[in-house]
């Protein structure tokens, strides 16, 4: 299946247009939205280490906890080392000293669509995320599940507002998004990267050549 793009993908990522078209069509999710998420999460793999579908991101240390220690014992990430950080973890606003898991060669974010190793432990430890079609399909499943959860928690939310909240949930989780909306806060306050939703929507529209390409089923 061929996807027409108003703005071309980078040369080494052109194959992702067909992946997004095939998976998006089968799952009922806009392929332009999928490409927008891929851009925001990994710059189509260019921001990963190593570059490409098998690369990882998010190299910020995480403090040791019983659950985290258990996961790392069951399926350790290569190059993630347990260390005492005298100065703490500034990115997480944790003062030192703190015992933490510190990524060196492998990060917590898996693949083109950056599934978190801990939040999606079974999927990530399987290694299936390295296959573009599989991680795109899994992203569709996550988006659809987040949308259903938001509809239950916020039954009056619909249209573009529901679509944007669904996109925010990909980054922050449906529960967190619903709480922020109930508290009258913006999606920018909720996501862990400023402008996350707009970045995805704008990029999706660039690829499509029209506004609203990211809306559900567009």
Describe each model-derived feature in a short phrase.
Residues 3-27, 71-218:
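Non-catalytic cell-wall polysaccharide-engagement segments
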Residues 29-79, 83, 87-88, 100:
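Secreted/periplasmic proteins that engage bacterial cell-wall peptidoglycan
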